[in-house]
Every structure is written in structure tokens, then in C-alpha cells.
Amino acid sequence: KIPIGALSLTFDNTKNYTLKKETDKIFQLVEQMLYYARSENTEKDYFVKQLQLDEVIHNVILKFRHSLMERKVIINIHDIENVVYTDEKWLTFILSQIVQNAIKYFDKQENKLTIYSQDNETNILLVIEDNGCGIKTSDLSRVFEKGFTGSNRNKANATGMGLYLSKKLCDRLGLKLDIASTEKEYTRLTIIFPKGTVHNFSE
């Protein structure tokens, strides 16, 4: 038996991109299931520390580099030098779900992914915006529901778990996750990191 991660690395060094894509899909589904199981006991599996946003974002983009290149995505990353305090692996997973969602729903000849952060008096905001198919206004209030894929999203083989898990984990980490979208134009997700507080996981 060969671990899925090892298979993925093997295909990185070959031209068998079709097999690699299918392996990546399996890996992502398994990852979602594992994090779903672990999300019930986040307090037993977290380590809050100072994180440089640029390093975390770089690693997530690197993780999806093949898919981003395949879709010929124009990536605009700027102003991400801010520091936040949270758990690195959970934040990496949340960002991975958001970027993965963006890749699934790109539908333009010129696909764009924009990532930046903002610093205000009380929070650090991390914004991830794509110019994909967007979300219908009637669906927007339900995107964080478990299993909800929306009427625009069936074609992408969506599981309805990515944004649900992202929201759930943000809540557990004391972060806020906001979404804004216009159908056929864009989707923007904003992770809000409160300054100067450490979340109590017993809440």
C-alpha cells in the first residue's frame, strides 16, 4: 500500500498529470474528512503562535500550483506582511479550502485570484477574491451550511464541505469569516483576526 501523499509526490516527478489530478482529488477529500473529524475537538489539537501571513499564503499557493497553472490563473498577491496569532495548520487548511473552491469555479478566459491583507485598529483582515462564476443572491446566506453546493455549483463536483468546515474552524479559533459575491462577477472571502486576544476554546 502506498500512502496518497507519496503517490502525489511520485506524480510530481512524472508527466502523468491526469493520474496526479485524480490523486489530488482523493487527497483533498480525505483531508476534508480528517479535519471534519478533528474539528469536534479543536481544543485538543491546536497551537496558537505568531504567524507571518505571507509565509502561510505562499505555502498554500505552492500546494495548488499545478491546478492554478492549468487554469492559467493570474495571481495578484500584495500587502500580506501582517502578523496574526492563530494555529498554523488550521489556518492553512482554511485557506486551502477557499483557494480550492476558487479554482473549481473559475469560468472566465482570464481567471484572476487576488489575495491581500489590511490592518485596522482592532483587526487584521485577510481577503481572498476570485472572478469566478459567483454565487446567486438567494444562495449566499446558505453557503456555510453543511453539504450546501448552490445552484451554480453542481457542475464542479462540489461536496459542500469546504466553506462549511472553513466557517466552523474559524468560529472555533475565534476568527470571523465573511463572504460577499455577485453572480457571474466575483466571490470575496474575508478572514478577520482580532488583535490582542487569544480565543478560549472552552467557549
What do the PLM-derived regions correspond to, one by one?
Residues 41-46, 79, 83-86:
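Conserved micro-motifs of the catalytic ATP-binding
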